[in-house]
Amino acid sequence: MLLSPAAERSQGSLLSVIMEILKDQSHRELFGLELGSGTGQHVVHFAQEMPFVTWLPSDTKEESRNSIRAYIEATKAKTVLEPVHLDASEPWDKWAGLPQNSCDIILAINLLQYTPFSTAEGVFKGSGQILKQNGLLMTYGPYAINGTITPICNEQLDETLRQMNPEWGLPDIDVLRQLAFSNGMRMERMIEMPESNKCLVFRKL
């Protein structure tokens, strides 16, 4: 299985946010989709603390899906489904056969920074179709605000990402807000997180 130190550091604070935004629904059985699950550390950690959510992890890389399977087996996570191949930049009807209005929550953790803008567009278009009414999309990572990136460590990260791939980089929160609006969602909350990251919470109207 793969190990991400960054995922290990962030999983506790992310869990706290997700539990808080879902606390009013913890009496129901919920269905969650994680886009770009990576190693699988996050999803199994969430599953252990939130048994009321059934999670579907996804990733485009076979190596990552194998790692997710290993974490599921190692933790005996009963509410994490077999990981699927899902490219969020594709139209929603290619999202692993998920029907419209089928998800209560969709997570995109450190996905939008490491992918082209077409992926961000796909995430919001797809979420607008796949989420139930009042369902939530939560994105996490460092962002630009009104074209400005702070602090210096995030500026340096943005430069590094663009050197790796000119189409990568820190997305602007105002651009994401507009993408959400164009796809029947609104940005409901911006939560400050450790290490100069933020959680953005969007709700489907």
Curated annotation (Swiss-Prot):
* The protein's name in its UniProt record: Methyltransferase-like 26 B
SUPFAM superfamilies the UniProt entry points to = S-adenosyl-L-methionine-dependent methyltransferases
Family of the protein in this entry: Belongs to the UPF0585 family.
Q: By its UniProt entry, which Pfam families does this protein fall under?
A: DUF938
Q: Give the InterPro entries listed for this entry.
A: DUF938, SAM-dependent_MTases_sf
